[in-house]
Amino acid sequence: MMSMLGGLQRYFRVILLLLLALTLLLLAGFLHSDLELDTPLFGGQAEGPPVTNIMFLKTHKTASSTVLNILYRFAETHNLSVALPAGSRVHLGYPWLFLARYVEGVGSQQRFNIMCNHLRFNLPQVQKVMPNDTFYFSILRNPVFQLESSFIYYKTYAPAFRGAPSLDAFLASPRTFYNDSRHLRNVYAKNNMWFDFGFDPNAQCEEGYVRARIAEVERRFRLVLIAEHLDESLVLLRRRLRWALDDVVAFRLNSRSARSVARLSPETRERARSWCALDWRLYEHFNRTLWAQLRAELGPRRLRGEVERLRARRRELASLCLQDGGALKNHTQIRDPRLRPYQSGKADILGYNLRPGLDNQTLGVCQRLVMPELQYMARLYALQFPEKPLKNIPFLGA
């Protein structure tokens, strides 16, 4: 009888051990399945201090103002120096090739942490301003929609656009309106992103030349964001820079109302790709590169989780900061003149109203999130160079 009881006890112990092992296996599988979502962003890579020496090539009409706001905020909250335009300038010498003397306060030993204002890339001169360990990145947009945006925004500035009644008309016969000899005023009218990288926008789209220039960009720029996939791009940027989530959360800035966006026919889109063939090759290449990097470093499941975290935090901040659920406002509806964006050409540039009654600390956070780039540049200039006259933003007095 005793031996039978002993046998039963051993039997139940074995069963309990098997159940315990099965439970542990199931738990391990559950934890592994959630690892992509719950692991901190920097899991699987060497951790370290946040990157603070950064050069962002701010291309035109590519969501770059939103990225600029991210960098300005990081610089201000971390007490970093910014390479700001000298004197009364609002850009770093654009459309001429960048020279170090376009930066306020530059000297033989002076180096800055962050450079992100509009310039035409010129590496030897940039290296006179930025440290050797600088992280270089930029952003591109589908050239069809980048050109459409430029046509509206620079309609009254670029000679090629002034004479064209519509983008359809311009692209139907671009040489009627575009003159190579006036390209410094017409930089927005053909291969503008290619131009911003320091290349010739009127060069022939020959395979060897294009590949050599793209390789040149790849050697210098460690990341190229894509405007159509901005949230995914910001997730990867955050990973590369080792920043906190709030550092890369941003609201859309310098965006247009829907009524000022032209609908383009398939024929017009194809003409735009052909006219801006160099931009198209650049965009195609780095769009593929971005997704290859995302797959390699994050994987689809983890990427979805990180993008949702970013969007959820943006919604939280919008609820905290913005009136009317964060609806974009026409500039005439923005109560605080310091938050009104600059209006250009035929574009209707939108902005935000902040919720009333915010405490001072929250108000400061929210103001930085929605501050247009010219006002923010003037703010940083005053903080960085208190002994110099304030930057003048003329349209604020209008």
UniProtKB/Swiss-Prot annotation:
Glycosylated sites: 79, 132, 179, 287, 330, 360
Enzyme Commission number(s): 2.8.2.-
Protein name: Galactose-3-O-sulfotransferase 2
Membrane topology classification: Single-pass type II membrane protein
GO molecular function: galactose 3-O-sulfotransferase activity; galactosylceramide sulfotransferase activity; sulfotransferase activity
Enzyme class: transferase
Cytoplasmic topological domain: 1-10
Main location group: Golgi
Pathway membership, UniProt: Protein modification; carbohydrate sulfation
Pfam families linked to this entry: Gal-3-0_sulfotr
A cellular-component GO term for this protein: membrane
SUPFAM superfamilies: P-loop containing nucleoside triphosphate hydrolases
Family label: Belongs to the galactose-3-O-sulfotransferase family.
Keywords: Glycoprotein, Golgi apparatus, Membrane, Signal-anchor, Transferase, Transmembrane, Transmembrane helix
pH dependence as annotated: Optimum pH is 6.0-6.5.
Any one Gene Ontology BP term: glycoprotein biosynthetic process
Keyword Transmembrane helix: yes
Transmembrane segments: 11-31
Lineage: Eukaryota, Metazoa, Chordata, Craniata, Vertebrata
Lumenal-side positions: 32-398
Control of this protein's activity: Strongly inhibited by Cu(2+) and Zn(2+).
Tissue specificity: Ubiquitous. Detected in heart, stomach, colon, liver and spleen, in epithelial cells lining the lower to middle layer of the crypts in colonic mucosa, hepatocytes surrounding the central vein of the liver, extravillous cytotrophoblasts in the basal plate of the septum of the placenta, renal tubules of the kidney, and neuronal cells of the cerebral cortex.
Compartments, as annotated in UniProt: Golgi apparatus, Golgi stack membrane
